A protein has these predicted regions:
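A short, N-terminal "cap"/entry segment at the start of jelly-roll beta-barrel domains
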Residues: 1-28, 43, 109-131
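Conserved short histidine dyad/triad with adjacent acidic residue
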Residues: 17, 32-47
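Short histidine-centered beta-strand/loop micro-motifs
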Residues: 22, 42-48, 89-91
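Ligand-binding loop in jelly-roll beta-barrel domains
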Residues: 25, 62, 82-108
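Short strand-coil-strand connectors
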Residues: 27, 64-68
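Glycine- and acidic-residue-biased ligand/ion/polar-headgroup-sensing regions
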Residues: 49-51, 55-61
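Short acidic-glycine-tyrosine-enriched beta hairpin
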Residues: 67-83
């Protein structure tokens, strides 16, 4: 099929990662919808190969990248090169909904690494909505 429609709501409920790429059959790049609860402290991480684009759909995102910390609202976005550590948190009192797109020359496999080993368990417990 040459196209596919979907919505975040169709990909699951609650907080966590929603696999847009799988649901829509995308193979050229990685893409997830991410829903963070109010006050969620993000996960500082980097990638071997994938750059990422974070797009804020709703809520507020506190983005720590390099030496900079910036708050983004709906419509805000940031591009982060693969090996640059980044952390996205939700400083607000409403859920944060983001679209995260990653890729490098068509590479879509998982290649992320947590900076703080304690975040490995926290990330695993955070939840993944299966699709």
């Amino acid at each position: 099929m040459g196209y596919a429609f979907g919505s975040i709501d169709e990909l699951g409920e609650g907080f966590g990662f929603r696999k847009v790429r799988r649901a829509l059959g995308i193979t050229a790049f990685g893409v997830n919808a991410v829903v963070y609860p109010p006050g969620h402290d993000g996960f500082k991480h980097y990638h071997d190969t994938q750059d990422e684009l974070y797009f804020v759909h709703s809520g507020r995102a506190l983005v720590e990248v390099g030496d900079e910390v910036r708050e983004l609202g709906p419509g805000g976005m940031v591009h982060v090169e693969s090996t640059t550590p980044r952390k996205v948190s939700n400083p607000g009192d409403e859920p944060l909904v983001m679209l995260v797109v990653g890729g490098k020359d068509g590479y879509v496999e998982r290649d992320g690494h947590m900076v703080d080993p304690a975040d490995v368990e926290r990330r695993a417990a955070f939840g993944k909505v299966a699709n």
